[in-house]
């Protein structure tokens, strides 16, 4: 999974999270 401020990521239940800073 991608992390930090690089973009979007899917959390463990598949919800799209925006810029995860």
From Swiss-Prot:
Keyword Disulfide bond annotated: yes
Gene Ontology BP term (one): regulation of blood pressure
Source organism of this protein record: Tityus serrulatus (Brazilian scorpion)
GO molecular function: hormone activity; toxin activity
Pfam families, sorted: ANP
A cellular-component GO term for this protein: extracellular region
Protein name listed in UniProt: Natriuretic peptide TsNP
Function noted in UniProt: Scorpion venom natriuretic peptide that increases the perfusion pressure, glomerular filtration rate and urinary flow in the isolated perfused rat kidney assay. Induces a decrease of the percentages of renal transport for sodium, potassium and chloride and an increase of the urinary cGMP concentration. Also down-regulates the mRNA expression of natriuretic peptide receptor 1 (NPR1) in the kidneys whereas it up-regulates those of NPR2, NPR3 and guanylyl cyclase C (GUCY2C) mRNAs. May exhibit hypotensive and vasodepressor activities.
UniProt cross-references to InterPro entries, sorted A to Z: Natr_peptide (IPR000663), Natr_peptide_CS (IPR030480), Natriuretic_peptide_brain (IPR002408)
Tissue/organ expression: Expressed by the venom gland.
TM spans (from-to): none
Keyword Phosphoprotein carried by entry: no
Keywords: Disulfide bond, Hypotensive agent, Secreted, Toxin, Vasoactive, Vasodilator
Major place of residence: secreted
Similarity comment text for this entry: Belongs to the natriuretic peptide family.
Cell compartments where the protein resides: Secreted
Disulphide bond pairs: 5-21
């Amino acid at each position: 999974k991608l992390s930090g401020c690089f973009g979007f990521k899917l959390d463990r239940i598949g919800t799209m999270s925006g810029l995860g800073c």
